[in-house]
């Protein structure tokens, strides 16, 4: 392992009905005036009665609050700025997002803006840094992004539709209330997209250039991915299966709090590429990741085919014999894994064959939960000009490349996006 810091200050309150405790938690962490941040006005947060329950809990704890709604997927900087303006005027000292990653990231952005005196664009483009944010608590309703325990946020700058991130431990929420029952109403597509995002947060850490022994972190990561693999297939068919929903919710947090990347360098190239898809086409984040990853993997797997082979064996049960026959074992996903035709290439080594079979196994799993594995399946058809624009934006301000497993230039990114069509 390489040297690492692991910091997880977020208090987790997990289980049915825990949202009733939100007021006490805000008080315990020093809050007085709360800004509640959530999605669509008149949406499920309101119609389900959840917002009313949160209001009551805050009032019972003697807290005042102001609501800010209107968060959308691929959250916009303009709403963050509106929240900063309102928060300063109202004397807000505590932020309470109710929702998933987009809502939480919006709250993190508002916290940075209230606590500091700079333009948010400067923070997102890396021109300034800060270690100051307001205190944040979360009522989680979507298992996906893991922002409830992470240090990072991703926001869309409407000028140029650029998605950019910033991360610091000061933005890690003080607490997160996680009731799996609050995810029962999610559509199957959103559930599956969330599961793909959870998987990808660990996969981005699993495919690493670090060549020291990280076997302990590997086993943690592989166990999490197997659990998500299975729970997702249950949850899309049985939306009120508590155990499947609980597994996804907890896995979402563990997948993005640093645990599955401890002691090694993470990649995150696929995330950076998908951010450009989200910025240009406003696609669901997890679905966009699923649509791109297979092409990224086939483009870079020769860098370390053994890593992909291990992924296939440990996560999808791919066994490969000396004769290069691929057979899923009993621990494989529900749908049979069909090797890619490319594995018949006589110039491929057995490790190459296993690596390519692993990539196909991931795509088979994606299809089993109705996730796309190409841009066409995602429902978008970027032109070559649009692809070149996305590739250019992807490396903008990043020293001309993204990723660490195999650093990618804008030419590499364009090639991957063309492969993904």
Language-model segment annotations:
Residues 1-94, 375:
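ATP/NTP phosphate-donor binding region
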Residues 20, 115-216, 310:
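A glycine/threonine-rich phosphate-anchoring loop and its flanking beta-alpha core
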Residues 53, 81-84, 103-116, 149-150:
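Short Gly/Thr/Asp-enriched flexible loops that form oxyanion-binding sites at enzyme active sites
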Residues 92-110, 141-147, 280-283:
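Glycine/serine-rich anion-binding loops at beta->alpha junctions
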